[in-house]
Regions:
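Pepsin/retropepsin-fold aspartyl endopeptidases
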Residues: 1-168
Length: 168
């Protein structure tokens, strides 16, 4: 089932931050990986042509890829079926290589904020200066807790604008 659609960016790798593309957040009731069931698996799908395996799967078991014999194996850490559903925010906050906190993916199209907009405040915590990229990718940089947050961003007119986002 589709939980949301949006434009934006959220991935970063050796090639830098991905370009903004159409994203779809989808969830399936059950996903079976090498005979092991996972419940409520949600992921972000994109039309990017490169294959990706979420490293989050490693929290639930070990993966073996045998290229010589062309096989894939998954050895779960437990026999129970884990529920993997994790709510996501209406706006995914992202630090870009230029050092600014920005809206990565915007799932709720009704919000005034758009992908790429610079965020200057999260729950009263100001982000007037650039962030260190290493720190931003290894530590929690934004005070997000609970199921609701207030963020301020710079709108297209160059003015600060407030928006309330929710975790769903």
């Amino acid at each position: 089932r589709t939980l949301g659609e949006g434009m934006g960016f959220s991935s970063m790798g050796v090639g830098g931050v991905e370009a903004a593309t159409r994203k779809v957040r989808v969830c399936t009731d059950t996903l079976t990986v090498a005979g092991y069931k996972l419940a409520n698996v949600c992921c972000i799908a994109t039309d990017n042509p490169t294959s990706r395996i979420g490293t989050g799967l490693l929290a639930y078991g070990d993966i073996t890829i045998d290229y010589i014999h062309n096989t894939f194996a998954f050895s779960p850490h437990t026999d129970t079926t884990p529920n993997l559903y994790q709510p996501d925010w209406d706006v995914v906050l992202t630090v870009t290589p230029d050092g600014w906190l920005r809206a990565g993916i915007v799932w709720d199209k009704r919000l005034a904020i758009h992908s790429g907009d610079r965020i200057v405040e999260v729950n009263g915590h100001r982000f007037d200066n650039k962030l260190d990229m290493r720190e931003a990718t290894t530590k929690a940089f934004a005070p997000l807790s609970g199921n609701k947050a207030v963020i301020k961003f710079i709108n297209k007119k160059g003015k600060e604008q407030k928006v309330v986002i929710k975790r769903r």
